[in-house]
UniProtKB/Swiss-Prot annotation:
NCBIfam families: hisT_truA. Disulfide bonds: none annotated. This is tRNA pseudouridine synthase A. Substrate binds at residue 109. It holds the Pfam family PseudoU_synth_1. Belongs to the tRNA pseudouridine synthase TruA family. It comes from Histophilus somni (strain 2336). It is an enzyme of class 5 (isomerase).
Length: 269
């Protein structure tokens, strides 16, 4: 039997998704809980291997098991055996041809920036604090240069193991809610550190250090050393993974926290 799970987690205290020796990972905690509930070892496969300190509200995973449990039993049983910063939002029996990573058609991330001169005591984690005033309109305009299929070498980490730097960005929206700026980006897939590297350069543009057209220039140069430093992991969330409709997977409300779909006409920003 193959089971898919919708997972959310606060990645602050984890060295990323992937199991590694001598450090704590989300995969390790989840595999331990699933294996306990299933009464057999179950290996977990995820849609997106998030880095150290990165969070998720819409991670999707799957595992194979001989255990017969109801979807409700999987959800409540796993949550009873997971730490407080990892939670299962849904469980579903899926067909044998489903794979959390290879069946996915798109991944969507949100980067949450607390844009205020003073830091917040209520959100010491889960957001990236940027004290310099940012113009989210300029950031949004710059992001439109990245839409479509491109070579994203300028936003690719040096240690990236992908065979190709080509990716297809479906949308990139930047919007503000009070003191929070949200960068919402969806693509077929991402190279290593791609979202955080893009956000790093958007911050330069939003703070007035670089013009909007700089983003277009960076893309054409295909040189990571020319772009801005990588943005911190604190504000990054994997919020949605998309699959073909025939898998009929449940959908979590888009997060994090209070964030839903923005009611903004981006064409007139």
């Amino acid at each position: 039997m193959k089971i898919a799970l919708g997972i959310e987690y606060n990645g602050t205290h984890y060295f990323g998704w992937q199991r590694q020796a001598n450090v704590t990972s989300v995969q390790e905690k989840l595999e331990s809980a699933v294996s306990f509930v299933a009464n057999e070892f179950c290996q977990i496969y995820c849609a997106g291997r998030t880095d150290s300190g990165v969070h998720a509200t819409g991670q999707v995973v799957h595992f194979d098991t001989k255990a017969i449990r109801s979807e409700k039993a999987w959800t409540f049983g796993l949550n009873a055996n997971l730490p407080a910063d990892i939670a299962v939002r849904w469980a579903k029996v899926v067909s044998e041809d489903f794979h959390a990573r290879f069946s996915a058609t798109a991944r969507r991330y949100r980067y949450l920036i607390y844009n205020h001169p003073l830091r917040s005591a209520l959100f010491p984690t889960g957001v990236t604090h940027h004290h310099v005033a940012l113009d989210h309109h300029l950031m949004h305009q710059a992001g439109q240069y990245l839409l479509g299929e491109h070579d994203f070498s300028s936003f690719r980490a040096a240690q990236c193991q992908s065979n190709t730097p080509w990716r297809n960005i479906h949308h990139l929206h930047v919007f503000r809610q009070a003191n929070y700026i949200i960068v919402d980006i969806q693509a077929n897939a991402f190279v290593h550190h791609m979202v955080r590297n893009i956000v790093g350069s958007l911050l330069e543009i939003g703070s007035g250090k670089q013009p909007v057209e700089w983003m277009d220039w960076l893309l054409t140069q295909k040189d990571r050393t020319l772009a801005a430093p990588t943005a911190k992991p604190d504000g990054l969330y994997l919020v949605e993974v998309k699959y073909p409709n025939h898998f009929n997977l449940p959908k979590n409300p888009l997060g994090p926290l209070f964030l839903g779909e923005p009611k903004i006409d981006f064409h007139h920003d």
